[in-house]
Amino acid sequence: MSYGSCVSRLLRTRVQSVLKKSVHSVAVIGAPFSQGQKRKGVECGPAAIRDAGLVKRLSDLGCRLKDYGDLSFTPVPKDDLYNNLIVNPRSVGLANQELAEVVNRAVSGGYSCVTVGGDHSLAIGTISGHARHCPDLCVVWVDAHADINTPLTTSSGNLHGQPVSFLLRELQDKVPQLPGFSWIKPCISSPSIVYIGLRDVDPPEHFILKKYDIQYFSMRDIDRLGIQKVMEQTFDLLIGKKQRPIHLSFDIDAFDPTLAPATGTPGCGGADLSRRMYISEEIHNTGLLSALDLVEVNPRLAASDEEAKATASLAVDVIASSFGQTREGGHTVYEQLPPPSSPHESENAERVRI
């Protein structure tokens, strides 16, 4: 081995010995599911997000990864409408039951669980599975929509606009039992969820938010208060009195469609990049993030390949910022600078650098 190779190897060993290892053990679950709504393509979201470099980005941040791959959900051959309106109830119920098992297994194994969808009906499974291991969890729901319609208030029949109603204890007597949903047990109470970024809320949803005193911050509130104040109030409510696991459920349509056009229900007036990244950065800084959903990336709805890639890349940015990437740059953290052990070694290192 040459003299230069020996010195280079010595330097690499010394630098690696002072790198602080990440505390994050992250499980990645792909959930290619679209039957919570009617538009095809959102089942391609997990592949698009993976292609945008998700696993490498998390690995570069020092995360210890367990990749469950993309799940294959059991098909339901005959899935009639419920009440002549609700779309694919048996498929949604069964897929979420299967997803809940995997999420529970990941969280029980000590991993922070990242689920990439897929439509937002998947939150029924991710939060249910998470709550089995962490019954005191709290939820930060970042979305343009409240997704809290019930099967009796929805006008679209799409279950991706209803997941919270199945999870909220206060609505237990307001939600009929759909075929395929008998396994679901409400697992969160209204003080345990905060919405951030709402800008398209149906009248029945607004009634529910007010009646059950559910905290939400609309885009108007964010403009009025500033995102820093919004996050301070969110944490004061959810973890101010008790430290507990956080479940971040993030719909890509929270961004303005100029930034994330490849999604099924875009709406003007969404947040810019810095405000949304601040949310995930601050959640990371609590040290309490236990599970994360990133949903509703639909590459088929992009007007161009560039739009599809930009939306998927933004999804990766959200996930990475939840695990330590900052807008200062995502760095493996140093505990200290590596000192030279002797003047001779310092001289050799200088030669290598030159």
Swiss-Prot record:
It holds the Pfam family Arginase. Residues 1-22 form a transit peptide. Substrate binds at residues 145-149, 156-158, 202, 265, 296. Residues 330-354 are annotated as: Disordered. One of its GO terms (biological process) is arginine catabolic process to ornithine. Mn(2+) 1 binds at residues 120, 143, 147, 251. Keywords: Adaptive immunity, Arginine metabolism, Hydrolase, Immunity, Innate immunity, Manganese, Metal-binding, Mitochondrion, Transit peptide, Urea cycle. Residues 344-354 have a biased composition (Basic and acidic residues). This is Arginase-2, mitochondrial. The lineage of its organism: Eukaryota, Metazoa, Chordata, Craniata, Vertebrata.
